[in-house]
């Protein structure tokens, strides 16, 4: 987008975004990466993983971001979130909710 967007802390100096910002597919795709991938997303409360060693696959904003993650509750009752993709082969690691101490790639073993 070549048009300059004036974002000013003083609302009196700010301007309305150009119509192209709301209609251009390239701007939308760029916004998904620049805005939505860098912010927090609510994916559930801790009641779904009360048991220890539980692994729950979640897709963040399906059909929009399609970011696969794993919610994991360790045996020490510590809830964490990890990418659900093997960084080497791009393989999905956890396909359904399960109880396991380890996350194991089906490709690597």
Regions found by a protein language model. Give the residues of each.
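N-terminal pre-ligand scaffold of iron-sulfur
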Residues: 1-96
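General beta-strand recognition
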Residues: 80, 102-104
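Short cysteine clusters
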Residues: 86, 105-108
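Short cysteine/histidine-rich zinc-coordinating motifs and their immediately flanking basic loops
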Residues: 96-102
């Amino acid at each position: 987008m070549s048009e300059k967007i004036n974002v000013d802390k003083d609302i009196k100096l700010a301007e309305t975004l150009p119509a192209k910002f709301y209609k251009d597919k390239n701007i939308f795709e760029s916004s998904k990466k620049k805005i939505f991938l860098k912010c927090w997303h609510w994916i559930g409360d801790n009641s779904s993983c009360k048991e220890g060693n539980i692994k729950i696959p979640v897709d963040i904003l399906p059909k929009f971001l399609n970011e696969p993650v794993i919610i994991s509750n360790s045996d020490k009752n510590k809830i964490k979130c990890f990418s659900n993709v093997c960084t080497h082969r791009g393989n999905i690691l956890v396909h359904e909710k399960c109880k396991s101490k380890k996350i194991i790639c089906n490709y690597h073993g």
